[in-house]
């Protein structure tokens, strides 16, 4: 019963209040000080109000300006050594350690991977890994979460950006030893104010279609998310943003950290298979790459 559930929560030092009771009468009723102030049919609520429509225009992309195939302008005329140093200072690449240190990653004493690995804690980890809380004993079960988003790619093509965001978040799970085929996704979306401009509506539409394509390709569904369509101030607009968060389960004892484990370690690059015609990941090959031992 609702009352007994409240008592159980109080035993665990959690505040709980009964706010509703589910019945089989197919109606939503709300009372205030003994008076019924709402009485609606569930069938009416299921219609979800008036159906809304918007005109959408998805603009084609310039294949010659694909961010993944371009050398950033600030690096073009530099030598390899100078370009490497300059690249490390770019916002998309530079260290985020100052920001990371503002958050306490040790709360709850369940952290498996600290944000930075290695003797000097300078190697950023690919994902968050933490044991699940248990009332008694010890557990080896851990939750794993990683994100994916490439801002400059998003400006070029929201469709491709969303597909690669999903790919990146799942790849990071694989890097720490979590099986991405069992993961679930949640998306954080942030776009400019759409108004009634079809080309503006086309950006979130393209991003969602790109994310859907990736979900189908990886057989990995998104089960939640949060969106905002208010990213405009005067004549400034946020870039089209769809950040993919991949969440999975793993074993803490099998987690792989990012730092080198010994001298003379071999470093191998496992490239994401890309379709030359579409510029998108080849999902079936990527799945094999992510799940291979």
Outline where the language-model segments fall.
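Glycine/proline-enriched, intrinsically flexible loops and inter-domain linkers
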Residues: 1-292
């Amino acid at each position: 019963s609702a009352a007994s559930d409240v008592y159980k929560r109080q035993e665990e030092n959690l505040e709980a209040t009964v706010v509703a009771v589910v019945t089989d009468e197919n109606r939503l009723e709300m009372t205030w000080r003994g008076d019924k102030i709402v009485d609606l049919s569930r069938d009416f609520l299921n219609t979800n109000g008036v159906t809304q429509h918007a005109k959408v225009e998805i603009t084609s992309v310039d294949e010659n300006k694909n961010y993944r195939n371009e050398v950033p302008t600030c690096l073009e005329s530099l030598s390899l050594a100078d370009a490497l140093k300059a690249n490390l200072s770019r916002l998309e690449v530079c260290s985020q350690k100052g920001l990371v240190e503002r958050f306490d990653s040790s709360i709850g004493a369940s952290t498996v991977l600290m944000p930075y690995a290695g003797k000097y804690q300078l190697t950023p980890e690919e994902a968050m890994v933490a044991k699940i809380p248990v009332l008694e004993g010890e557990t080896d079960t851990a939750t794993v979460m990683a994100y994916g988003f490439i801002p400059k790619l998003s400006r070029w093509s929201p469709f491709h950006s969303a597909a690669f965001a999903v790919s990146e978040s799942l790849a990071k799970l694989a890097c720490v030893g979590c099986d991405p085929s069992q993961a679930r996704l949640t998306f954080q979306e942030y776009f400019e104010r759409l108004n009634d401009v079809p080309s503006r509506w086309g950006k979130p539409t393209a991003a969602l279609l790109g994310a859907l394509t990736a979900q189908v390709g990886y057989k990995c569904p998104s089960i939640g998310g949060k969106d905002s369509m208010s990213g405009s101030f005067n004549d400034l607009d946020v870039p089209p943003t769809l950040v993919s968060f991949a969440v999975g389960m793993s074993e803490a004892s099998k987690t792989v950290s990012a730092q080198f484990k010994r001298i003379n370690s071999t470093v191998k690059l496992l490239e994401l298979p890309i379709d030359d015609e579409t510029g998108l990941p080849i999902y079936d090959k990527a799945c094999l790459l992510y799940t291979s031992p």
